[in-house]
Amino acid sequence: MAQDSALPLLPVAPTYVSWRDQQIATYQAGTGRPVLLIHSINAAASAFEMREPFQRLSRQFAVHALDLLGYGNSSRPPWRYRAAIYVDLITAMLDRIGEPTALVASSLGAAYAVLAAARRPQLVSRLALICPTGIGQLDRGPGIAAYTVYQLLRSPFGRVLYEALTTRASIRIFLASQAYANPDNITLDRLEGFYQTCRRPGAYYAPICFLSGLLNCDIAPTFATLPQPTLVVWGSDAKTSPLALASNFVRTRVATKVVTINQASLLVQDEQPEAFMAQVGPFLASP
């Protein structure tokens, strides 16, 4: 993607790296111990949702972020995406950074971060997981039904459905019902940022894999033996992934610490950035 056509998702311009013959948009700011930010998975997902922690953490850390393949400023090939692709991509990012890195990851992206951390334990120092899935939610691997839905969504009907789900009005409804506890926090700038990333060429290929269930993954066995310190951050008002799901992570791994941020939904880090940083900043700075 040409530099001048890149979406302004973060306060720095993307740098592109080649991965499996595709261009991955990466972002970096600050100095210090490395932190890698990993966004969630949905039709409007991109590094845009990580702009608050990116700016705030870069005052103390060398902060890295990326747009996962199929999202943001990264390439959007017409692939049949699977969870393993994203775990491989995060692993490649860790290899590229090349030193112990803290992961801050959201939702299904957090599940992929856990699997990458288990694959490269020497390159992941700790994890902060925001409303993670993969235990008790989005943890059933794809079967016949998922592939049937995928084929339907790859049809002209699926394209029409995607267009309907990614109008500004539809995105506002999604953000108000799932992403933000207070609809007043959905500013015009925020809405436009989410809308624009849905309207890039090829934007529909990865989200239909998510909607089909092809991106699900069960992380319970891996999470149970994860050696790194792990903090789980949950929005008190999250509906799609409600706070009650946090108990699944604690039962699976007793050493897991859970903190709740009030007046926040799934995008905790964007809706309540100060409260988020008050919990995550000291955790990342710990020896």
Locate each region found by the language model:
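Active-site loop/oxyanion-hole signature of alpha/beta-hydrolase fold enzymes
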Residues: 51, 61-104, 269, 278
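Conserved hydrolase catalytic core segment
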Residues: 99-141
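Conserved loop-alpha-helix segment in the C-terminal half of the alpha/beta-hydrolase fold
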Residues: 225-264
